[in-house]
Amino acid sequence: MYCPFCSANDTKVIDSRLVSDGHQVRRRRECLACHERYTTFESAELVMPRIIKRDGSREPFNEDKMLSGLTRALEKRPVSMEQIELAVNKLKSQMRATGEREISSEMLGDLIMAQLKELDKVAYLRFASVYLSFEDISEFADEITRLGKEKNGKAKKAKPAKTAK
């Protein structure tokens, strides 16, 4: 690596450690020519899959677009920006884990809906109303009923069984 101070090519690594939950390496370096020290950060360059839109067109993945959609759905809900950013990172990991170079916008929408369902049910309904193109109030009611059944089903499973004494 070239020294940022004197442009010499010989530098040595003094210290290396993982940062950002193991997603980056922080290296402390020293130039062998001018003896200046500086810090570098290294991270893997991960390529996100392209998105295949409903009309068949393709576009590069746009993290800002996904973040704004999540933020819009979660507007005025008790979810912190940190939780939203964690959700975005989880979604990006899920997209990369498919191993595909391209994924459909439907698949991405399904991943987003699953993430919103975990974060906030009201935000999930907001997003679903647009994503699933609800036509009337009965479709809202059906989705709310489905959410209620899922919640009740999980609650029943979570309760420990009573034992006789």
Curated annotation (Swiss-Prot):
GO annotation (BP), single: negative regulation of DNA-templated transcription
Zinc finger (unnamed): 3-34
Family matches, as InterPro entries: ATP-cone_dom, NrdR-like_N, RNR_NrdR-like
Assigned keywords, A-Z: ATP-binding, DNA-binding, Metal-binding, Nucleotide-binding, Repressor, Transcription, Transcription regulation, Zinc, Zinc-finger
Domain of life of the native organism: Bacteria
UniProt xrefs under PROSITE patterns: ATP_CONE
Gene Ontology MF terms: ATP binding; DNA binding; zinc ion binding
Cofactor note (record): Binds 1 zinc ion.
Co-factor requirement: Zn(2+)
Residues annotated as domain ATP-cone: 49-139
Physiological role: Negatively regulates transcription of bacterial ribonucleotide reductase nrd genes and operons by binding to NrdR-boxes.
HAMAP family: NrdR
Family: Belongs to the NrdR family.
Protein name: Transcriptional repressor NrdR
Provenance organism: Colwellia psychrerythraea (strain 34H / ATCC BAA-681)
Name of encoding gene: nrdR
